[in-house]
């Protein structure tokens, strides 16, 4: 079968071609393609009947290749944001994915998205025992980096920017009911100072303390865990001399250094068994001509009792505040 259409904006689907086959073992699409005047999509997939019945041995695979051309981006915008289109790269946005395996082990060989000379994002990893809540596990690694992202500025009137060389790396992990994520945001000037700065933290390796050991400047790092069975969570955030002005060039917020720790159990904050503990420190906050430092805060909740405290001790002020309720 072939299907074509033309939308009022001028977006035109010029061809569609595909084939579906099935037997007692598999449903498969050996070929499916869609094309517009500037873009294309290619899909191949296999799904075992066992997978649909949540059995572990059924085959599961998919390959996707897609490109969205600048011409179609212009048609979707309908002539708006002409400055954005003038600075948008004359290259297609590319998306590629390749996954293969079964419910015992699903391997994400490739997940890529990017715009040439602008940015790229990549992910890969394995997921294990997906139907077993106690044995499931796996790791997904993520990496993203920016290059020339100036074409975004017209969309936000210059209020938001991503400087060339800004990067994000991360790892997502599963171990039974526990999930973990470790994200590292680096500005172009970031440099590792200790081994911990580059050591991955996962649900398998949580003995290090970000708030005490992470020292990389011009960087921010988030580590978090969540237990699906207990609704228990833990998170650490460390920000070291992160220049917020690089992201918000029209704002007056510059260097920020701070750390935050949170842990707890339960998501119903009206239940007596729900508890959480939060503590943090602001070591540096540069706003306009003000350079603030020396702020500590804590908050705890347990058995319907909330306690919060703020301590500010620096050259400009000395303040203590407390809330009990």
What are these regions (language model features)?
Residues 2-325:
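Interface amphipathic segments
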């Amino acid at each position: 079968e072939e299907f074509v259409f033309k939308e009022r904006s001028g977006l035109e689907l010029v061809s569609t071609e595909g084939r579906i086959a099935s037997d007692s073992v598999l449903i498969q699409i050996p070929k499916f393609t869609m094309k517009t005047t500037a873009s294309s999509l290619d899909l191949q997939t296999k799904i075992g009947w066992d997978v649909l019945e949540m059995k572990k041995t059924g085959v599961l695979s998919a390959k996707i290749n897609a490109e969205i051309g600048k011409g179609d981006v212009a048609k979707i915008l309908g002539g708006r944001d002409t400055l954005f289109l003038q600075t948008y790269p004359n290259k297609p946005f590319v998306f590629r994915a390749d996954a293969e395996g079964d419910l015992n082990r699903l391997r994400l060989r490739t997940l890529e998205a990017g715009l040439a000379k602008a940015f790229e994002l990549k992910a890969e990893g394995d997921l294990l025992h997906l139907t077993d809540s106690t044995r499931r596990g796996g790791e997904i690694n993520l990496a993203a980096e920016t290059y020339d992202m100036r074409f975004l500025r017209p969309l936000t009137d210059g209020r938001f920017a991503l400087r060339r060389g800004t990067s994000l790396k991360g790892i997502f992990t599963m171990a039974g009911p526990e999930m973990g994520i470790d994200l590292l945001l680096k500005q172009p000037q970031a440099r590792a100072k200790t081994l911990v700065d580059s050591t991955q933290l996962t649900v398998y390796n949580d003995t290090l303390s970000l708030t005490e050991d992470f020292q990389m400047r011009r960087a921010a790092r988030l580590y978090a865990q969540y237990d699906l069975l207990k609704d228990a969570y833990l998170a650490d955030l460390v920000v070291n001399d992160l220049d917020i002005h690089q992201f918000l060039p029209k704002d007056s917020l510059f260097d920020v250094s701070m750390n935050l720790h949170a842990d707890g159990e339960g998501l119903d904050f009206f239940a007596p068994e729900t508890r959480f503990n939060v503590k943090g420190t602001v070591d540096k906050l540069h706003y306009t001509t003000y350079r603030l430092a020396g702020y500590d805060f804590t908050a705890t909740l347990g058995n319907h009792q909330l306690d919060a405290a703020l301590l500010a001790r620096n050259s400009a002020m000395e303040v203590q505040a407390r809330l009990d309720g």
